[in-house]
Amino acid sequence: MIKKIGVLTSGGDAPGMNAAIRGVVRAALSKGLDVYGIHDGYLGLYEGRIEQLDRHSVSDVINRGGTFLGSARFPEFRDEKVREKAVENMREFGLDALVVIGGDGSYLGAKRLTEMGFPCIGLPGTIDNDVAGTDYTIGYFTALETVVEAIDRLRDTSSSHQRISIVEVMGRYCGDLTLAAAIAGGCEYIVLPEVEFKREDLVEEIKVGITKGKKHAIVAITEHICDVDELAKFIEQETGRETRSTVLGHIQRGGAPVAYDRILASRMGAYSIELLLQGYGGRCVGIQNEKLVHHDIIDAVENMKRPFKGDWLDTAKMLF
């Protein structure tokens, strides 16, 4: 019988994590459970930095970006002895279960703890939208708004100087954020990790645009594909057009979550408590066709593949 649960945020922060924590805490309290917050993710669990939360602990956090519990990357958690120490701390505080908010790496930690006798539920918290088993992750829509706003601003200056602008977008190895932002921002060219990229092909596309009368352009590219500064130099050299690169970086992770992220996080947080009370563990929550679902964590991480939005890319190419 579950009486006490813990909640932590792990990996890169994402707007809406606070809303998810609030959803977990308020839903758990409504069911008569005690809730404990773990500071700085699995690192805090290992170090025993755990404190009890009440309704007031999550007051006025739904609109705040980041995570008030803090987050940290802690690869040492893969070590069984490290996990045993974390389990010892959970026992010391009398915790029966855990809700983990984060990405794939965070999910695997939750699965290992479940195997050690502590049922865990994972919630997808990342701006990259790269977690399998869900259409959208907590933080994605807020980051999308941030990127589109940046593209709009770049367009203003690019058009003024008849310049080509390259904007590098986060996403790790998933192009969802770049693709959606490119469509919403009217970017002329898109470079995604899911599609083979040759800089010479991009230059040819840009040259075609120039012959059609394009005076300026925006190139949206997902991180880790190439050095965008070098790409800018190559484009300028080959086209004769002034070209500048902009790396948006961690600004994409910040800011107050948009309404949809707050709603999604709240629903997922409350749903995680329902699953724990039903006896589930080692599961991850998702939203598919606007319905909350749950999957086995290992199945989601190792076997499920996120479908590439090829139809979105086709649409984007028609519009440019």
From Swiss-Prot:
Pathway: Carbohydrate degradation; glycolysis; D-glyceraldehyde 3-phosphate and glycerone phosphate from D-glucose: step 3/4. Its EC number is 2.7.1.11. The keyword Calcium does not apply. One of its GO terms (molecular function) is identical protein binding. Substrate binds at residues 126-128, 163, 170-172, 223, 244, 250-253. It holds the Pfam family PFK. Belongs to the phosphofructokinase type A (PFKA) family. ATP-dependent PFK group I subfamily. Prokaryotic clade 'B1' sub-subfamily. Catalyzes the phosphorylation of D-fructose 6-phosphate to fructose 1,6-bisphosphate by ATP, the first committing step of glycolysis. This is ATP-dependent 6-phosphofructokinase. It comes from Edwardsiella ictaluri (strain 93-146).
